[in-house]
From Swiss-Prot:
Keyword rRNA-binding: no
Function, as annotated: F(1)F(0) ATP synthase produces ATP from ADP in the presence of a proton or sodium gradient. F-type ATPases consist of two structural domains, F(1) containing the extramembraneous catalytic core and F(0) containing the membrane proton channel, linked together by a central stalk and a peripheral stalk. During catalysis, ATP synthesis in the catalytic domain of F(1) is coupled via a rotary mechanism of the central stalk subunits to proton translocation.
Propiece span(s): 1-19
Lineage of origin: Bacteria, Pseudomonadati, Pseudomonadota, Alphaproteobacteria, Rhodobacterales
Species per Swiss-Prot/TrEMBL record: Rhodobacter capsulatus (Rhodopseudomonas capsulata)
HAMAP family to which the protein is assigned, alphabetical: ATP_synth_b_bprime
A GO cellular component entry from the record: plasma membrane-derived chromatophore membrane
Transmembrane segments: 29-49
Keyword field: ATP synthesis, CF(0), Hydrogen ion transport, Ion transport, Membrane, Transmembrane, Transmembrane helix, Transport
InterPro entries per the UniProt record, alphabetical: ATP_synth_b/b'su_bac/chlpt (IPR002146), ATP_synthase_B_chain (IPR050059)
Protein name as catalogued: ATP synthase subunit b
Protein's cellular compartments: Cellular chromatophore membrane
Gene Ontology molecular function, alphabetical: proton-transporting ATP synthase activity, rotational mechanism; proton-transporting ATPase activity, rotational mechanism
Length: 185
């Protein structure tokens, strides 16, 4: 590589390209530039600048490759994490759907139970109302009967008072007292 570079430089510095006078002269600007360039290239080669440049380029390429590998590893890890989160999200969604379905079932059962309880309460209240009505009817009948008995007794007492004599009244009172005594004993 070094020889090829030197050969190209030497061919490029052909005396035919010189502008004036002999080519190998310090007065010829092209010759001076050629010599300076060759010295510069020689110094670069002496201090191993091309190998240092190649080493730096290789090092940079390795750094870029390492960065790319790290980026690929991070991308793979991110994809794994994303897949994990998506799986967890599906599981959570499934659990949420199950919870909602269970809540709907529970609400339906609670509504049915409330309807049954309401029907039972209405039936109890109707039964209680019917019992109160029957009791009120019985009380009214008793009151009517009692009043009828009172009226009948009063009417009978008046009829008897008008038709009975004092001795008959006294005999009836004695008979009633005797009957009460026998019943009490």
């Amino acid at each position: 590589m070094k020889k090829l570079t030197f050969l190209l430089v030497a061919l490029a510095a052909n005396p035919a390209f010189a502008s004036e006078g002999p080519f190998v002269s310090l007065r010829n600007a092209h010759f001076v530039i050629l010599v300076a360039f060759l010295i510069f290239v020689g110094v670069l080669i002496k201090f191993k600048v091309p190998s240092m440049l190649l080493g730096m380029l290789d090092k940079r390429a390795e750094g870029i490759k390492a960065d790319l590998d790290e980026a690929k590893a991070l991308r793979d890890e991110a994809q794994k994490i994303l897949a994990s989160y998506e799986r967890k999200a599906r599981e959570v969604q499934g659990q949420a759907d199950e919870i909602v379905a269970a809540a709907k079932r529970d609400a339906q059962l609670a509504a049915e139970q409330a309807k049954a309880d309401l029907k039972e309460a209405i039936a109890r209240r109707l039964k209680g109302a019917e019992d109160r009505i029957a009791s009120a009817e019985a009380a009214a009948l008793k009151d009517v009967k009692d009043r009828a008995v009172q009226v009948a007794v009063a009417a009978a007492a008046e009829v008897l008072a008008n038709q009975m004599s004092a001795s008959d009244k006294s005999g009836m009172i004695d008979a009633a007292i005797t009957e009460v005594e026998t019943r009490l004993n």
